[in-house]
Amino acid sequence: MTSGEEIRKFWADTRAALDQVDPQLTMEAVESSDPFAREGNIKSRTTYRTIMSSFEGVRIRAWYTVPSGKPPARGWPAILEVPGYGGILPLPIHLVQYGYAVLTLYPRGQGESLHEWQIEHGTRVVYNVTDRDRYYYRGAYMDCVRGVDFLSGRPEVDAGRIGVWGFSQGGGLSLATAALDRRIVAAVAGVPWLCNFPVAAESTTSPYSELHDYLTQHPERRAQAMASLAYFDQLNLAEQIACPVLVGGALIDEVHPLKTIMPVFERIRSLKSIVIYPDTDHEYRTDFTYHAKAWMDRYLR
């Protein structure tokens, strides 16, 4: 069984390796990607195509959207927004219009970052799953931390007011980022993934079914795969979270079942709250967006 100390050392070493990578940042204002950037004749925000180097030198892409006009004296509060499985994310108009700078980040091999790097074989959740050092989510988690590096270094951003927000896979990435980076001041995780792998591995509903099928087809690799996944399981990272966390769950969600989420939530030691919907499955509720924005306003304003 992997100890908490082993997990902490693994991530400390991984963070140290990321810190050695020059971001080689490029930014280009791309107004055509945000057709609603003007309200009437008034420009309300600017969106930049942002490309940077992350863990092991892999290039990743993001949209950086910032309100127009002079920032407040201490800078804009900022939110790192991370995607569901596959990298689908809308531009965060609902956040920027309320005065947040937002980095909409696509981890390696997802969404916009497919232009820079692609998985050679298999799927993300089982990519090198038996090798903790080469597993897909080692790089993906560090891509999120690189996003925090970006925001904390922006002159128009208040580095003391950075949050992370995500749904589904993005919920898992939000929890992981909050656990691995103390610069995160608030986190929102809607129906998070990457939780409680020993239970999740029995699910036959996509995308956890990718893991289930792999372990069924390769039973001789199960022990090694589960030992590797322990380093990436929110169940083992949750106790490292120090910021306020809002979690969303759903009783009839078969994609990310509540039985995978609740044990993680229970291990979070910081201030926390959970919203559980009794009558919805794996879907984004509009009212959860209101709860999430109120959470960010409370801790980032």
Each language-model region and where it sits:
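C-terminal catalytic histidine-bearing segment of alpha/beta-hydrolase fold enzymes
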Residues: 3, 262-301
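N-terminal cap/lid segment of alpha/beta-hydrolase-fold proteins
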Residues: 21-73
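Cap/lid segment of the alpha/beta-hydrolase catalytic domain
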Residues: 90-96, 101-142, 199
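Gly/Ser-rich "nucleophile elbow"/oxyanion-hole loop immediately N-terminal to the catalytic nucleophile
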Residues: 125-168
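Short glycine-enriched nucleophile-adjacent loop
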Residues: 151-152, 164-165, 171-182, 187, ...
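Hydrolase active-site cap/lid region
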Residues: 175-221, 276, 284
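Short beta-strand/loop motif that positions the catalytic acidic residue
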Residues: 241, 247-249
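Conserved alpha/beta-hydrolase "acid-adjacent" motif
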Residues: 254-260
